[in-house]
Amino acid sequence: MKVYLIYVLAAVAEIAGCFSFWAWLKLGKTGWILLPGMVALAAFAWLLTLVATEAAGRAYAAYGGIYIAASLFWLWGVEGHAPDRWDIAGGVVCLAGTAIILFGPRG
């Protein structure tokens, strides 16, 4: 369960950090919004190093599904746009892929 918590925290940090650039460049927010955004992006990178795996690529691949699901929650909770059925179906498929990567037998 610890790995899921790390991935969820990493996703929130990455999305918040990237959104700071979106807010600055597309929504006309002040450039100062980039400071907490860059801290969030650094936290995201650090959090992924806490995943117990021998290969960075595997950690990143498994994280991808969590990121997608978290992005859909961000879409709904922060931006006020409800995900449609295709968003939800895609998120479920990605989470299934994450589970396969995390829990599949290793040879």
From Swiss-Prot:
It is found in: Cell inner membrane. The keyword Membrane applies. This is UPF0060 membrane protein Atu1058. Its main location: membrane. Belongs to the UPF0060 family. It is a multi-pass membrane protein. Keywords: Cell inner membrane, Cell membrane, Membrane, Transmembrane, Transmembrane helix. It comes from the Bacteria. Pfam families: UPF0060. It comes from Agrobacterium fabrum (strain C58 / ATCC 33970). HAMAP family: UPF0060. One of its GO terms (cellular component) is plasma membrane. The chain crosses the membrane at residues 5-25, 32-52, 59-79, 85-105. InterPro entries: UPF0060.
